[in-house]
Design a protein with these regions (language model features):
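Surface-exposed loop/turn motifs in large extracellular/passenger domains
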Residues: 1-15, 21-40, 46-66, 70-93, ...
Length: 180
């Protein structure tokens, strides 16, 4: 699949995957969360790889956003670059990387304006690594506004980061040049 565009506007759904399911590679995903309600959002696919995954939260009721995909074989489900933008919106938990296996190479999270993160903020994935021992990755969290009610972690939850983690906090942390 070349490019997959998904927009949530005015409905309630359990899960959104930006990419493919159980086969193929999606080159680009763009998930836009405008209104409605969703439990889990994945920029990547289900058990598949995505080259560039982007999730933008602009007003939907969202429980958890993952920049990468869900599941995959030990090294399957690779997300090369993920970007999450939370713009003047509310999310419970945010993970820059994959969930439950697979690998994210590079993950960037941008929190802007009056955004509210009511739970945890992880630069990496949940039970999914950032990079590999032989191929380093990177997480970057940029916070230029908003409130994070719990903790901020540059790395992953119950997984490793092979590479670097960066957390930038302040008015100039997210600029027009930050990945979107």
């Amino acid at each position: 699949v070349g490019t997959a565009n998904v927009t949530l506007e005015g409905i309630t759904i359990n899960t959104i995957h930006g990419g493919s399911k159980d086969g193929g590679v999606t080159t680009n995903t763009n998930v836009m969360l405008k209104s409605g309600k969703v439990t889990n959002v994945y920029g990547g696919g289900l058990g598949t790889s995505t080259t560039i995954a982007k999730v933008t939260q602009e007003g939907a009721d969202v429980e958890t956003i993952y920049g990468g995909g869900y599941a995959g074989i030990e090294f399957g489900g690779i997300t090369t670059n993920s970007t999450i933008n939370v713009n003047n919106s509310k999310v419970e938990n945010v993970y820059g990387g994959n969930r439950d296996k697979g690998i994210t190479k590079n993950a960037t999270i941008n929190i802007r304006g009056t955004s509210l993160i009511t739970g945890e903020l992880y630069g990496g994935g949940k039970r999914a690594n950032i990079g590999r021992e032989s191929d380093a990755g990177k997480t970057t969290i940029n916070i230029s506004g908003g409130t994070i009610n719990k903790d901020i972690y540059g790395g992953s939850e119950i997984a490793a980061v092979y590479g670097t983690t960066n957390i930038n906090i302040g008015v100039e942390a997210v600029t027009d040049d930050s990945p979107e």
